Amino acid sequence: MIKEKITNEFIEDICRQFGIEGDFKYYEVLTNGHINTSYKVFFYRDGEMKDYCLQRINSYVFKNPVEVMENISNVTEYIRSVIKSSGITAKRLVLHFQAAQDGKYYYIGPNGGFWRCSRFIDESETFNQTDNLAIIEEAGKAFGDFQLKLVDFPVKNLYITIPHFHNTIMRYEAFYEAVKNDSCGRASGVKEEIERYKSLEGVATEMYKMQRRGELPLKVTHNDTKCNNVLFDKSTGEYLCVIDLDTVMPGLVGFDFGDAIRFIANSAKEDEKDLSKVKLDLNKFEAFAKGFTGKLKSVLSENEKDTLALGALTMTLECGLRFLTDYLNGDVYFKTCYEEHNLDRARCQLALAEDMISKRNEMKAIVAKYAG
C-alpha cells in the first residue's frame, strides 16, 4: 500500500483537489474499518463548519480502485434517482461524493495514493455495537431498503471489484494453501482451529454451490453489512442510509443478511479473547431479521428466504476462515493491533458459528415468522 507523509498541509491539498472551499481547520483520523485509511476533515465556510470524509483506498485490497468508484457512483446515483422519483429530497438519504477537478470521483495523489472525498451527512451517527433492539431493527431496515431500491438495477453493469469475494470454495483453497506453505511458522500453534474449520467446510460452501446451480439469484449486494455502516438520524433514531460501499457487487441476499448477523448479533466483540462470552443473541437476530425481511419479503424467492439463516452461519465461517488464513500468511490483509489479533478474531468467529449451529432451528423459525 502507498505510504504518504500525512500533514495538515497534505490533507488540505488533497481536499482542494475536490473543489472544497473555505478555511481548513483540522482533521481527525477515523479508526473504524480494517481496510482503508480515513480522515474527517473540517473546513469553515459561510459562517459554519463543514465536514468531509477523506479516504485513501487500499490498493492492495482493491486492485482496480477506478472500478470501485464507478460502482459506487453508479449505485448512489441510481438510489438518488429512485428517492427523487418519490418526491423526497435525497440529501441525507444517500452518500454524495465530491468530483475532482477533472470531473472524476477520485484523485491520484503525488505519491500514487488513490483518494476520494464525500460529504458527512448532517446530524447523523453510527453505532459500532449496540444492545438497543430498535436500532438493530432499523439497521435491518436500512440494508433491506438498500437492496429494495436496487432491485431493478442491472446487476451485469457492476464490476466485480474483488473476484471470488464470497466464493467459499476458493476461500477454503486459500486456507489450505496457507496451511501447507506455513510461511510464518504459525500452523503448529493452531492445529485445533485448523481442524475445526476443516470439519465445517461442507456447510460453509453450501450456498455458493446453490448459486452455481442456479438455485439462488445474484443481486446487487453491499457485502459489508455491519451496523457501523448505517447512518442514523441523531434526533429520531431512524436509519438514513448505508455507507462504505467499496464492496458493492453482485452477490447473494443471504450473504448480506448473514454478514450483518455475525456482527450485530454476536454477544461479544469481534476479537473477544474469552470465548465463553461469544454467543448468538437471538433477540438481536430477531430484531434485525424483522427489519430486513420486512423491507424485502415481497421480492425474495423461497430459496432466498430459506437460506437467510444459513447465510449467517456461512458468513461467520467465511470471515473466521479469512482471519485464520491471514494469520497464517503473516497478517498481510487485515489491519491488526497486536501479533495474534487475527487469531483471536478467527477463534471468536468459530465459537459464534458453532453456537449458530446449535440454534439453527430457532434462527430459521424467526426468519419464517417475518419473511412470510
Range-by-range predicted roles:
Residues 305-315:
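Small/polar glycine-rich anion-binding or flexible loop at a beta-alpha turn
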Residues 254-298, 314-333:
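Active-site activation/catalytic loop segments of kinase-like enzymes and analogous catalytic loops
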Residues 228-269:
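Catalytic activation segment of kinase domains across protein kinase-like and atypical kinase folds
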Residues 356-359:
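Long, compositionally biased intrinsically disordered regions
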Residues 2-5, 21, 28-32, 55-56, ...:
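ATP-dependent phospho-/nucleotidyl transfer catalytic cores
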